[in-house]
């Protein structure tokens, strides 16, 4: 059997998706324990800004969602977040650096790009460990953007270097939905 992790099939715009990511993001927030407002770059196609907004409300943290202003960015997503900062659309690295400048200027805490934080990666690793107790499989297929979620899952799927030994049947597959170079860096 092949099981496929598909976050893109989760969430409907009115009910938060029951992601493993949501639990991992919550763990990042709890480990940061912010005393200043949090700011995060939420890009088109991502539920992260909305999810963070809801999590921050639950945890009593102030949250600001930065986003690239464009006709494609869904208005209904913006309506769900209390405080937004529209940015001029540009390359991802430029937008992320702009959010860093805003954070420094206004004394906000900038959340790590793609939640690249040990608490997030370890939560994903533990999640797969729990799944493996219930399901037996050799192939793991994961969609990947930044590669951060993949990293936690990959670390648990099979310890290195046995993943590359010929007799090993376990295989990790990724379907790249972003830039391959960002995944290779992870």
Regions picked out by a protein language model, each given a short descriptive name:
Residues 1-186:
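PLP-dependent amino-acid enzyme catalytic core
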